[in-house]
């Protein structure tokens, strides 16, 4: 009691520092509905494991499908942490707790904006993973992936090759911080799932209780070692124990959990050199004390907790005890150079939640609400540029994110810019003078992370509650794929009776990135001149001494009546993938030789010789077609021959309710039946694939299916969308279904 009285006396004597005004003022009229929608979508780009068929983008694919195998478990799923591919459960669980807290506070906003199914789906993606990580009451796997190994490679998640060990804590080697945070995440999530899926909510709550007991019993982080240097627990574990017990109280109504939360008060961090509860940092992945104080104030109404959280929010707004967080010249509340915006926007969420509570003084509520809006608007672009990828004016284009960059050579410099739009990602933000450069290699100001977006989503939901906004109907992040597979070639040497060709098979796939061990190419020749000289096919030989592991054939018939043959360059069994300078392409040198003699051999009439130059510089050529299995993915072929039946290697979805059949008068690809095949057809097919287009007329549905099955495999899914896009871009001349 003496401690509390001394605390209140100190509070009565504090000095107040005025909040600075921004030097530059821009319009702050933003579409909070769209921003909320996109900030939620960010988590779909972070997904690890086997992705659902109804995913809302076309550049993420299945990845890390063997996670946990080193310990005989299935630890697939969850989110990659940031721009890397380690699954750090401490910040992941924090992000889940924050997202669930936002739904707890603003469920109506999510319903009204149409975003409730999406945020619940994203939360569940992580909580399903946490369930896998908790195979028994006192065992918890807190990390998958080795930070050093992961950070030493720069490439997309879908083609990772490095070992991904999994790490656990148990009674012998405990980790109270990460276990308690996961308990909080599971408890908070159980609350928001209870109205729609009470059985799943009960499962989450059971895990939350077991995890909390495990964390509270051990009270040690001795076994939490693999994340050191990345996500070390600087604040200790008592803030997480407090946080978790509060969420368990809210989930169960069990007074013992609330009593437990309050019992940790002697262990709460104090402001340096004082007996005051800490107020001068931020609610974040490491420190949950401030959110705990806010919830305790609302739950108990006790003046002690109320004063503690107000000290903290005052420090971030008008100042407290003679000090205040730094502000940039343009008005950003600036705590730290590493991810400055995640702190400011998370504080905006806390300020909004507290200001909306009836127990908050109206004058303070007005200050906190103004602060929250200014910080959110700063992130959205009030100073002239957005800090949210894919939103607003001049948004970041090159966040520090391996999969969004999608390098095929494992080099941060190649390509020059990110190939993908990481929609909704909040970047780290500017420095203390508002300076910011959109640089891929800047992991302090331009990286993104699960914890960055977590409080930001909550703040946006609060802005949507107050100011509204319109989410984009049926929004998806489908991109037009760029060139992924192709062949480069050059003439190494040539003479009267031979030609030596260097050909490079290249995989720069990114929609999504994927390896293939079924790539092959065809080099076409016309031997008419040799035949005219009486030379037979068996007198023409093909040799290859440097082939990168490929099987190089002798001449095979394509159109023998017209003397057209080809060399088959087959890399079957060799995985060519966009993951390094020696992995994304394979070179092959081969020589075609005819009996020596004037006029016995003429390269100029060969289909695949067109456009090739002699020398060391290879050039892209569409006259050497490339195949993935039986599907031609690049280039042209000469007339007269026939290609094998296409067998797409892309995983296909379920059979539609209407079986594709040939319908008279229907043109393949013309899914809107206007007699043309263009981007309008692509958009309509995309709506169908993501299940935002439905048919009430069975006959019209049958016509649509007949036109949409462009790959001819009897199913309508993203494969058809991919093939149709290639046709529209003139990368293929015929649909596989026509071949």
Swiss-Prot record:
Its EC number is 3.2.1.4. It comes from the Bacteria. Residues 28-470 are annotated as: Catalytic. It catalyses: Endohydrolysis of (1->4)-beta-D-glucosidic linkages in cellulose, lichenin and cereal beta-D-glucans. Residues 1-27 form the signal peptide. One of its GO terms (molecular function) is cellulase activity. InterPro entries: 6-hairpin_glycosidase_sf, 6hp_glycosidase-like_sf, CBM2/CBM3_carb-bd_dom_sf, CBM3, CBM3_sf, Dockerin_1_rpt, Dockerin_dom, Dockerin_dom_sf. It holds the Pfam family CBM_3. Its cofactor is Ca(2+). One of its GO terms (biological process) is cellulose catabolic process. Keywords: Calcium, Carbohydrate metabolism, Cellulose degradation, Glycosidase, Hydrolase, Polysaccharide degradation, Signal. Residues 480-639 form the CBM3 domain. Residues 664-737 form the Dockerin domain. The active site is at 84 (nucleophile), 400, 438, 447. Belongs to the glycosyl hydrolase 9 (cellulase E) family. This enzyme catalyzes the endohydrolysis of 1,4-beta-glucosidic linkages in cellulose, lichenin and cereal beta-D-glucans. This is Endoglucanase F.
């Amino acid at each position: 009691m003496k401690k509390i009285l001394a605390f209140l006396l100190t509070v009565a004597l504090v000095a107040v520092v005025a909040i600075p005004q921004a030097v530059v003022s821009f319009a702050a009229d933003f579409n909070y509905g769209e921003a909320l929608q996109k900030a939620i979508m960010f988590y779909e780009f972070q997904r690890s494991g086997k992705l659902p068929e109804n995913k809302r983008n076309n550049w993420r694919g299945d990845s890390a499908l063997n996670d946990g195998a080193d310990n005989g478990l299935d630890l697939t799923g969850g989110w990659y942490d940031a721009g890397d591919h380690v699954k750090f459960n401490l910040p992941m669980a924090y992000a889940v707790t924050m997202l669930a807290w936002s739904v707890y506070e603003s469920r109506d906003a999510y319903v009204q904006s149409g975003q409730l199914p999406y945020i619940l789906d994203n939360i569940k993606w992580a909580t399903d993973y946490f369930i896998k990580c908790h195979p028994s009451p006192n065992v918890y796997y807190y990390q998958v992936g080795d930070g050093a190994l992961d950070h030493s490679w720069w490439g997309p998640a879908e083609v990772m090759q490095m070992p991904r060990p999994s790490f656990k804590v148990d009674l012998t080697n405990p980790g109270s911080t990460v276990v308690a945070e996961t308990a909080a995440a599971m408890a908070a999530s159980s609350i928001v799932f209870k109205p729609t899926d009470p059985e799943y909510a009960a499962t989450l709550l059971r895990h939350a209780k077991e995890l909390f007991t495990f964390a509270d019993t051990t009270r040690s982080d001795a076994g939490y070692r693999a994340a050191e240097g990345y996500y070390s627990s600087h604040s200790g574990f008592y803030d997480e124990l407090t946080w978790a017990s509060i969420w368990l109280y809210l989930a169960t109504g069990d007074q013992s959990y609330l009593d437990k939360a309050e019992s940790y008060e002697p262990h709460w961090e104090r402001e340096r050199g004082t007996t005051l509860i800490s107020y001068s940092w931020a609610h974040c992945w490491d420190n949950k004390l401030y959110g705990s104080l806010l919830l305790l104030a609302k739950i108990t109404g006790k003046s002690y907790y109320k004063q503690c959280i107000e000290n903290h929010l005052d420090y971030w707004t008008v100042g407290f005890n003679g000090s205040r967080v730094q502000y940039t010249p343009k008005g950003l509340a600036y705590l730290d150079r590493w991810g400055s915006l995640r702190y400011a926007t998370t504080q905006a969420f806390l300020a909004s939640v507290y200001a909306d509570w009836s127990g908050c003084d109206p004058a303070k509520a007005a200050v906190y609400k103004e602060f929250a809006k200014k910080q959110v608007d700063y992130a959205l672009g009030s100073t002239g540029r957005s800090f949210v990828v894919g939103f607003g004016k001049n948004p970041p284009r090159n966040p520090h994110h391996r999969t969004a960059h999608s390098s095929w050579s494992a080099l941060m410099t190649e390509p020059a810019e990110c190939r993908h739009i990481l929609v909704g990602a909040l970047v780290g933000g500017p420095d203390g003078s508002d300076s910011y450069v959109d640089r891929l290699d800047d992991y302090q100001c331009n990286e993104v992370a699960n914890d960055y977006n977590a409080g930001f989503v909550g703040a946006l939901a609060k802005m949507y509650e107050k100011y509204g906004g319109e989410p984009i109907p049926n929004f998806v992040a489908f991109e037009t794929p760029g060139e992924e597979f192709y062949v480069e070639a050059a003439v190494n040497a040539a003479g009267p009776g031979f030609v030596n060709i260097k050909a490079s098979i290249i995989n720069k796939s990114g929609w999504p990135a994927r390896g293939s061990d079924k790539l092959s190419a065809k080099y076409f020749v016309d031997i008419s001149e040799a035949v005219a000289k009486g030379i037979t096919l068996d007198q023409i030989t093909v040799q290859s001494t440097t082939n990168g592991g490929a099987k190089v054939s002798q001449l095979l018939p394509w159109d023998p009546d017209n003397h057209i043959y080809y060399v088959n360059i087959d890399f079957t069994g060799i995985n060519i993938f966009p993951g390094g300078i020696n992995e994304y392409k394979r070179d092959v040198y081969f020589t075609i030789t005819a009996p020596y003699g004037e006029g016995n051999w003429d390269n100029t009439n060969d289909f695949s010789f067109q456009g090739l130059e002699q020398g060391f510089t290879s050039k892209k050529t569409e006259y050497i077609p490339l195949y993935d299995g039986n599907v031609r993915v690049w280039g042209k072929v000469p007339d007269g021959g026939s290609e094998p039946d296409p067998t797409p290697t892309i995983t296909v979805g379920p059979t539609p309710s209407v079986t594709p059949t040939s319908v008279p008068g229907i043109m393949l690809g013309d899914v809107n039946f206007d007699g043309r095949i263009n981007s309008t057809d692509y958009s309509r097919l995309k709506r169908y694939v993501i299940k935002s287009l439905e048919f009430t007329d069975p006959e019209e549905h049958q016509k649509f299916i007949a036109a949409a099955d462009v790959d001819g495999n009897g199913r309508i899914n993203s494969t058809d969308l991919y093939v149709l896009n290639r046709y529209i871009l003139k990368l293929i001349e015929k649909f596989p279904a026509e071949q």
